[in-house]
Amino acid sequence: MKYLIVCVTLALFAYINASPAYGNRGGYGGGYGGGYGPVQRVVYEEVPAYGPSRGYNSYPRSLRSEGNGGSAAAAAAASAAAVNPGTYKQYAIPSYELDGARGYEIGHGYGQRAY
């Protein structure tokens, strides 16, 4: 019984360290690029939608997921996150979103809009 508790504790510790919900800890030091190991993350690529695709009253935007370079670390991170490669739909959720084209957070009433 004592060995069972030790094994379950070690398995839980390994699962928490590998889980993306607590941050992908890559190698020694942890974090994104904070150590000696590889950076593990799942990359999403936005595919433009046809029709009006601006604002909250718009068609959903398609998202395609892929690992970084198809490496084993990215595959393990995607597997742990239960994200399968394919096409995803993103529906509008009221929050702040960063957009590289605009250079500021949506929701702030300043700056020149790019669209």
Curated annotation (Swiss-Prot):
Source organism, top-level taxon: Eukaryota
Membership in a protein family: Belongs to the chorion protein S15/S18 family.
Gene that specifies this protein: Cp15
InterPro entries tied to this protein: Chorion_2 (IPR005649)
Protein's GO biological process: chorion-containing eggshell formation
Keyword Zinc-finger: no
Name this polypeptide is given: Chorion protein S15
Signal peptide location: 1-18
Annotated compartments: Secreted
Major localization listed first in the record, in broad terms: secreted
Keyword Transmembrane helix: no
An MF annotation (GO) of this entry: structural constituent of egg chorion
A GO CC annotation given for this chain: egg chorion
Lineage summary: Eukaryota, Metazoa, Ecdysozoa, Arthropoda, Hexapoda
Keyword vocabulary terms for this entry: Secreted, Signal
Source organism of this protein record: Drosophila melanogaster
Matches recorded under Pfam families: Chorion_2
Function: Chorion membrane (egg shell) protein; plays a role in protecting the egg from the environment.
